[in-house]
Regions:
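Phosphopantetheine-dependent thiolation modules in NRPS/PKS and related acyl-activating systems
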Residues: 2-45, 49-83
């Protein structure tokens, strides 16, 4: 999966699931869109669907530090490369 595909998938998820229409890739989701821990859990579930396998507890823990779309995409790229 290319970076562009990851970005497009994440933007689609944010639009469909969280009604975030046209975010900047460096927007802080928590500050700008009031993204909370419940939203983060829902996003992790969608990321698992996107990559086609469950995340480990360690991977989920690492995800809790993510704040921007670029960081989400970096995170997914890292996980895909590891597998």
């Amino acid at each position: 999966m290319t970076r562009e595909m990851i970005v497009n998938n994440i933007l689609e998820i944010l639009k469909d699931e969280f009604e975030i229409a046209v975010p900047d890739l460096d927007d802080n989701l928590t500050e700008k869109y009031e993204f909370d821990s419940i939203d983060a859990i829902a996003l992790l579930e969608r990321i698992e669907e996107l990559i086609g396998s469950p995340l480990t507890q360690e991977e989920k823990k690492q995800a809790m530090e993510i704040r921007t779309i670029n960081q989400i995409c970096d995170y997914i790229e890292h996980i895909i490369k590891k597998r």
